[in-house]
């Protein structure tokens, strides 16, 4: 891992009329980026890598009647899922932008969505304090109770073991708790206790061994999933809105209220602190990133901002 690597701002993607709340990429379609926004839409982008325009919008996904808070893609990039404050989820055909399925059952804003690698189970987390498990056809298989405040994020833990069919998911909430659940039995596996404030975001490492979680107090906690215990804490020094593990380096990116911090985890150091220039804003009112996604090859970091713009960084070797 070269310690002289830095991230360079390569371009922007503009098309949303509200905060860019979520971003998704897929290994199956490396030139596809999906974004979700407070403008109630999602946009699929074709990534060109051009210096003038890093990508172009392909289509807008319309149907939600309120803010779209989260989105994800199936591994092959053929289908998209979205979670909205209109209390529903949607499954979309990426090629056409048509809604394939609606998921109705949550009693409040749906904050988060994810899907397992076999595309057989969809999970959602809501301000109604529940996590729901769905089939791809929209049937609710289970409602998981355990959080006693808003569920802010849910994620499927990557499982690379070919002979292991178990599905573990993780969740975080405003109750300051991180939880792990076994989806084969729909049971809670572990509580991870240590945060002192609302948790906005959590994510699992690509090999499924680590969880990172963070929120209002700026403390990023790293957890060992198998041992069910805390490992160490990184200080982001500002509220954290999104976390993303690099797919091919021991890096963790954190979108904070003042910039995007990219941490190396082994050895531990700050790789970069991404703070683009914002013309025409006072320091206090500067936009900040609220969503992150790495490209599947780990060379590009996408960030969605509160000025409705997606900014694109590429990993470069510093001379």
From Swiss-Prot:
Q: What happens when the gene is disrupted?
A: Defective activation of the ribosome quality control (RQC) pathway.
Q: Which InterPro entries match?
A: G-protein_beta_WD-40_rep, RACK1-like, WD40/YVTN_repeat-like_dom_sf, WD40_repeat_CS, WD40_repeat_dom_sf, WD40_rpt
**GO biological process terms held by the UniProt record:** cytoplasmic translation; G protein-coupled receptor signaling pathway; maintenance of translational fidelity; mRNA destabilization; negative regulation of gene expression; negative regulation of glucose mediated signaling pathway; negative regulation of translation; negative regulation of translational frameshifting
Claim: Nucleus is one of the keywords in the record:
no
* Keyword annotations from UniProtKB, A to Z: Acetylation, Cytoplasm, Isopeptide bond, Phosphoprotein, Repeat, Ribonucleoprotein, Ribosomal protein, Ubl conjugation, WD repeat
- Carrying N-acetylalanine, the residues are 2
Keyword flag Ribonucleoprotein: yes
Q: Name one Pfam family in it.
A: WD40
Major localization listed first in the record, in broad terms? cytoplasm
Q: The organism sits in which domain of life?
A: Eukaryota
Q: Where is this cross-link: Glycyl lysine isopeptide (Lys-Gly) (interchain with G-Cter in ubiquitin)?
A: 46, 53, 107, 137, 161
What's any one GO cellular component for it? Answer: cytosol
One molecular function GO term is:
GDP-dissociation inhibitor activity
Q: Where are the WD repeats?
A: 15-55, 63-102, 105-145, 147-191, 194-233, 235-275, 284-319
- Which Gene3D superfamilies does the protein's record reference? YVTN repeat-like/Quinoprotein amine dehydrogenase
Protein family membership: Belongs to the WD repeat G protein beta family. Ribosomal protein RACK1 subfamily.
Q: How does it assemble?
A: Component of the small ribosomal subunit (SSU). Mature yeast ribosomes consist of a small (40S) and a large (60S) subunit. The 40S small subunit contains 1 molecule of ribosomal RNA (18S rRNA) and 33 different proteins (encoded by 57 genes). The large 60S subunit contains 3 rRNA molecules (25S, 5.8S and 5S rRNA) and 46 different proteins (encoded by 81 genes). RACK1 is located at the head of the SSU in the vicinity of the mRNA exit channel. RACK1 interacts with the mRNA-binding protein SCP16. RACK1 also exists simultaneously as a homodimer in a cytosolic non-ribosome-bound form.
Query: Further notes on this entry?
Result: Present with 333112 molecules/cell in log phase SD medium.
According to UniProt, the name of this protein is Small ribosomal subunit protein RACK1
This protein's species is Saccharomyces cerevisiae (strain ATCC 204508 / S288c) (Baker's yeast)
């Amino acid at each position: 891992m070269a310690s002289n690597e830095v991230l360079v701002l390569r371009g922007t993607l503009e098309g949303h009329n509200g905060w860019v709340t979520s971003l998704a990429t897929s290994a199956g379609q490396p030139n596809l980026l999906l974004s979700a926004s407070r403008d109630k839409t999602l946009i699929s982008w074709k990534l060109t890598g051009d210096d003038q325009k890093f990508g172009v919008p392909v289509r807008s996904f319309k149907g939600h009647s309120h803010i779209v808070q989260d989105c994800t893609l199936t591994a092959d990039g053929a289908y998209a899922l979205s979670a909205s404050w209109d209390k529903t989820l949607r499954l979309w055909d990426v090629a056409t932008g048509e809604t394939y399925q609606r998921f109705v059952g949550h009693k409040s804003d749906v904050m988060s969505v994810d899907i397992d690698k076999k595309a057989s189970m969809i999970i959602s987390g809501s301000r109604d304090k529940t996590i729901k498990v769905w089939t791809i056809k929209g049937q609710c298989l289970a409602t998981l109770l355990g959080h006693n405040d808003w569920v802010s994020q849910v994620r499927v833990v990557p499982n690379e073991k070919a002979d292991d069919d178990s599905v573990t998911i993780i969740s975080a909430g405003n109750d300051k708790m991180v939880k792990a659940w076994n989806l084969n039995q729909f049971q809670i596996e572990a509580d991870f206790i240590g945060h002192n404030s609302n948790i906005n975001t959590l994510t699992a490492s690509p090999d499924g061994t680590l969880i990172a979680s963070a929120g209002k107090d700026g403390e990023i906690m790293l957890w060992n999933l198998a041992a069910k215990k805390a490992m160490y804490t990184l200080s982001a020094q500002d509220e954290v809105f999104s976390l993303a593990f690099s797919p091919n380096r021991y890096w963790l990116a954190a979108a904070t209220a003042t910039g995007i911090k990219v941490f190396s985890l082994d050895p531990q150091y700050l790789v970069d602190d991404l703070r683009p220039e914002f013309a025409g804003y006072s320091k206090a009112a500067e936009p900040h990133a609220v969503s992150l996604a790495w490209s599947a090859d780990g060379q590009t970091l996408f960030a969605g901002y509160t000025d409705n713009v997606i900014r694109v960084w590429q990993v470069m070797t510093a001379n």
